[in-house]
């Protein structure tokens, strides 16, 4: 199959994005991202050469991005890919010894195949004289996540879900807090709580709430619903988790054909945007890729949405045809319901491109127009595919090829590759260090750059002040109030607006959204509480991380890293390696500040980072300024500006 590529389109990508693609997504023989884009476009075209060409043109123009495994595991020619093109899996954990052992085996295989896993533990009986409860088993899962992964590309990741009514909910809530019995902790896992309508109604009414053993329904304890809710919010504010999964809302929106089969949603996935049924014989799959809303005006009148629905149906079929017997439940689920999850990124970039403030009715209007259009196009294509290829087996008579079509994943890596705002969330800063699987990169808001250029203020002094203010522009006297509103950062926004936008688009999204919330460190408890309550009241299916403003690392770094002078050497040195985006950004920062330095390539001199620094380090860059040891890139940023690098662990599997 012939697909014409244009290597000049590499110029549309930042250098660090190209480095990231080469390090994690391209095959060894692929010299350009365009070659990787061609490989994936052909692989997922279903043999349609015209579709393959369109897919290549879309992705090379940054209109969408393949999910990480869809790109990295796309086969070349008629061979098989390095792994499965599935981002994540959702598994049900039965309340039997056989089921628990089987879950462990399946989990290990799923991690090796490269997918993050959401495990649903609500039916495992509580602690008793004859049963240890779910926590010790979760401790073993915690160890598995360290051991099992797909090569260097995808680390094993796991999110455990438990009903709020489970008698072990308090211990489950605290299992990621590193105090207490280490044998009952799971520090490498994520946790999520299935929040029911009954519980929320008890919270509002100030009533007691029953904790029931899932084995027989026996009430083990009655507690204050409000106190439990307050504890949940407190732990979220402290650790960023647990995710909240509004399980009854999700089940109400399950397609009727699946309800008629007695299926139900028992939890979500690693990133809380996938809402599919699981059972003892069904492991749901996440088949993802995402549109770039920043370029909505360019692609809205094309067939891109329809083409991507068709492409994802092809990806799903490849998984069904090639999945090994070790993941037979996932294959069965994919075959029966054929769910896909077309997502989006770049929403905040789209607003800023048009000079629209996040906290505005105009933003709500754009939000509705965009997602109404995506939904209509996706539904039209699945109906076309049903005629062409047949309806999904669990939905005969539905007129659809796929039981689910849309899901908004976090898109951390995809957003970095396309230099756009991640997912449907606001930008964290207008100049910041963004941490992803490939490292940390300095990112500047290009729409702000355009405004600064028009005002004659696009200079080192302005950007240094923005970085010093942790990415904020509210201090800049030459910006008017409207411009300051457009470029508010995530933590400067009223978080109620994030919930409002999510609620406005939810009717057009059959699955869910990875909705992060951002609060300053000293946020009022009543404000944080109200935003969370509104998320349930307004019909969201869940909430992902709660991000709080981190303290400046400047002092912490000085405590962690001994800053000693090199003996008889007061040079500034950057020890680096080729194709290292961290190194390139470090040197850019030093040049920006007029700091002269020597660049030393460790590969050329045949030394390791540990050897040249005399420290137990194995990463680059390693930086000295005037003989003083600084450390890596993030340490450099803290040393130069006191700016806070972006905290928190992004979803490592569902970066659609």
Where are these regions (language model features)?
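Short loop/turn microsegments at loop-to-beta-strand junctions
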Residues: 402-404, 570, 618-620
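Short acidic, low-complexity intrinsically disordered linear motifs used
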Residues: 645-656
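Structural micro-motif
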Residues: 145, 541, 614-624, 633-634
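Extended catalytic cores of very large enzyme megasubunits
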Residues: 1-563
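Local sequence-structure signature of Cys/Sec-based thiol-disulfide redox active-site neighborhoods
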Residues: 240, 565-598
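A short glycine-rich beta-strand->turn/loop micro-motif centered on a GG-aromatic cluster
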Residues: 545-547, 573, 597-605
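Non-catalytic, surface beta->alpha helical segment in thiol-disulfide oxidoreductase systems
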Residues: 625-647
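Thioredoxin-like thiol-disulfide oxidoreductase module
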Residues: 600-618
